[in-house]
Amino acid sequence: MQPGGQPNMQQIMEQAQKMQQQLMTAQQELAEAEVSGSAGGGLVTAVVSGSGELKSVAIDPKAVDPDDTDTLSDLVVAAVRDANRAAQELQQEKMGPVTGALGGGQGLGGLGLPGL
């Protein structure tokens, strides 16, 4: 802080650069991570990246009933949703510390600027 309670611009820039690097690292970790979700007691499993991109769907042959494709469709949707929920939790885990430093994701309050 400079006299008068104003933050030092150099400190603000250093903190912003550090947070940017943390954000980039977290985004890279999310892109490389994979999480899975399942439905029907594991009959259908979906794998998504940490950023939510669908990677694969595995269907146990026991789940395939040619006379009841609606149930299989429901299981696939449920498995993908479960995997996406897991990806969102991972995103919160990885990005939470970074967005928390930004004032809980509400602007630039974490930079120490008055009034923010």
UniProtKB/Swiss-Prot annotation:
Instruction: Provide any one GO MF term from the record.
Output: DNA binding
Q: Where in the cell is it found?
A: Cytoplasm, Nucleoid
First-listed, main subcellular location of the protein, grouped into a coarse class: cytoplasm
Q: Which GO terms describe its cellular component?
A: bacterial nucleoid; cytosol
**Positions with biased composition (Gly residues):** 101-116
Positions of the UniProt region annotated as Disordered: 90-116
Domain of life, per lineage? Bacteria
Keyword annotations of the record = Cytoplasm, DNA-binding
Q: Which InterPro entries match?
A: YbaB-like_sf, YbaB/EbfC
Q: Which family does it belong to?
A: Belongs to the YbaB/EbfC family.
NCBIfam families recorded: DNA_YbaB_EbfC
Q: What job does this protein perform? A: Binds to DNA and alters its conformation. May be involved in regulation of gene expression, nucleoid organization and DNA protection.
Q: How does it assemble?
A: Homodimer.
Please report the name of this protein according to its UniProt entry.
Answer: Nucleoid-associated protein SACE_0254
Q: Which organism is it from?
A: Saccharopolyspora erythraea (strain ATCC 11635 / DSM 40517 / JCM 4748 / NBRC 13426 / NCIMB 8594 / NRRL 2338)
